[in-house]
Amino acid sequence: MLSRSARCSRAVLFSAKRSLASQANTGANASANQVMVSKHVQDIDPEMYDILTKERKRQKHSITLIPSENFTSKSVMDLLGSEMQNKYSEGYPGERYYGGNQFIDMAESLCQKRALELYNLDPQLWGVNVQPLSGAPANLYAYSAVMETNDRLMGLDLPHGGHLSHGYQLPSGTKISYISKYFQTMPYHVDSQTGIIDYDFLSKTSKLFRPKVIVAGASAYSRVLDYKRFKEIADACGAYLMSDMAHISGLVAAGVTRSPFEYSDIVTTTTHKSLRGPRGAMIFYRKGVRKVTKKGKEVLYDLDKRINFSVFPGHQGGPHNHTISALAVALKQAATPEFKEYQAAVVENARIFGEELVKKGFELVSGGTDTHLILINLSNLGIDGARLETLLENINIAANKNTIPGDKSALFPSGLRVGTPAMTTRGFGPQEFAQVAAYIDRAVKLAIGIKSQESPDAKDARSKLASFKELCKESDQVKQLADEVYQWVGEFPVPGEL
């Protein structure tokens, strides 16, 4: 008779052989299609994998200054590439049009719960929809919930720091944003001298225009918003106050800037900027009593059903469950002490970055920043935002040209927009942003010199810019500076490297 240990050894060996045989049979029986869908991208599509590799390298070795960009966490990326994307789930938790959604319901409900908790919102007084695919559609869904076609909307003018999704049309009447086709839109402005929103102008024009919605929000405005004043203005003309905190939602979550929730009826946000989540959006909306009439009658909000219906089935079909699940992870991270420290650093880095730019002779729109964002006025430097953006890209610095008050062209504006969230994520502090300011200063000097060499055959603005781009690629000074930046920034890890 075999000993107990021998019997155990034989059992283990038999089990291992059976497992290997099973795997062999599975492999032998697998169809070509099953084999294909089990391969990694580097095996199935080397061409696309090569592009991915190049983009990873670009991000690693570039200074990312675009304020709306960030580096999301490895754990968020885990969910974005997960099985959560396989499931169709039209509808809402507990009310789906497809079966098999019990875990999808859990994920979406958890995401909603964390969103309300992050901003200290009472679920009896606030609700949130986490299904919008991105920020501009989220704004459209919110407008459509409370307005009919041709109702009136006011938002910050695009050249003054607003966003296309708040409505934009040219002085000639040409409607650039389709929001201005669906609704009647009128902009409000910043004061031309201070660069600060002209609340008195908004108050006067809103009483004449009588909008249904006033949007408090911006994409290129570096100062805190006076939500209390916005609410007073909205109440005076009977409008909903909708705050778009897409750029600052991470700062709001960490308590390092003013929150819109105290005074707003609706709050929208993207989730991938300062919040550092996946590319998505959320719509928060009030519940309960909206106002009390002179006769003492309570008028209740009815935003819950209207906004949820506007999202689905009004505009969207199946939500992106991998994004919602990834957002839930990002919201958990945003509630941590580490995230609060990060956001405090974002604001402090922006302040110091702005001061360093001023020391080098740059003028900042509004004189500085209270947030994560800086808008540089280039109008007195002999270079435009389009050319400076081009040269910066050639030296591995990503920033973006931007209109400033008084600009006539969005293609050749006088501003450059920069911000601190992405590089703060990678470990930049005051010393590093001082170095970035020095790089921008060197870039401006190079750009001015290269501009003077543009081809005399280039007659129109686009041809001149094309000539400038070619000269940038050929410049030895540009190549030397590009290599310097490449080596320096590559020393700072991207998420997932530690």
UniProtKB/Swiss-Prot annotation:
Modified residues (N6-(pyridoxal phosphate)lysine): 273
Entry-linked InterPro entries: PyrdxlP-dep_Trfase, PyrdxlP-dep_Trfase_major, PyrdxlP-dep_Trfase_small, Ser_HO-MeTrfase, Ser_HO-MeTrfase-like, Ser_HO-MeTrfase_PLP_BS, SHMT-like_dom
The EC number(s) this enzyme carries: 2.1.2.1
GO biological process terms held by the UniProt record: glycine biosynthetic process from serine; tetrahydrofolate interconversion
GO cellular component: mitochondrion
Matches recorded under PROSITE patterns: SHMT
Reactions mediated catalytically: (6R)-5,10-methylene-5,6,7,8-tetrahydrofolate + glycine + H2O = (6S)-5,6,7,8-tetrahydrofolate + L-serine
Pathway the protein takes part in: One-carbon metabolism; tetrahydrofolate interconversion
UniProt-annotated location(s): Mitochondrion
Domain of life of the source: Eukaryota
Cofactor: pyridoxal 5'-phosphate
Further details from the record: In eukaryotes there are two forms of the enzymes: a cytosolic one and a mitochondrial one.
Family the UniProt entry places it in: Belongs to the SHMT family.
Entry function: Interconversion of serine and glycine.
HAMAP family reported in the protein's UniProt record: SHMT (MF_00051)
Quaternary state and interactors: Homotetramer.
PANTHER family: SERINE HYDROXYMETHYLTRANSFERASE, SERINE HYDROXYMETHYLTRANSFERASE, MITOCHONDRIAL
Protein name as annotated: Serine hydroxymethyltransferase, mitochondrial
Species this protein is from: Kluyveromyces lactis (strain ATCC 8585 / CBS 2359 / DSM 70799 / NBRC 1267 / NRRL Y-1140 / WM37) (Yeast)
